[in-house]
Amino acid sequence: APPQNYLWLQELRKVQELHWSLKDNGLDMFRLDGFVTYTVREPEGRLVSYDLYPPVIEESFEADGTVALIINDGMHRVYLARQEWVVPQVVYVRGVPKAFPYYAYPRPQGWEGLDLLAENPDRHTYLKKCHRIRHNKTLYRDFQAVFKNVGGSRSELNR
């Protein structure tokens, strides 16, 4: 289940372009065994490398006893896979101590009613996620500690 109430169309287009570019180079974004490093040219000409690993799905036990499968990382990729009728290879995380749940709740309605937005919404007027605790970043999974340039916005792909 997605934890986020929207997808950003600009990011979805970048993910789709990355999918096509990787495919042109013999790699399938939805069938990664491990991770791949790719390089993009920023608008000012600088080359920047990024790591890409499969989407991360985390098992989460909710208050009503439901076991939710939260998209921890890779929501735009999972959405694109759904649009292409592909079941993507994922990293499945289970056994997380109950004291350290994912920092936001899964959407009870799943993908239904998810907003596709042209602009990244203002956090003061739009609820991106329903956080579990006030200081939610204390529960954040920091993949940047292991991989290069992950979790941030991707630049336009070098063609």
Question: Positions of the model-derived regions?
Answer:
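Short alpha-helix boundary/capping and kink motifs at helix termini
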Residues: 1-70, 82-83, 94
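Basic- and aromatic-enriched surface patches that contact anionic nucleotides/nucleic acids
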Residues: 66-159
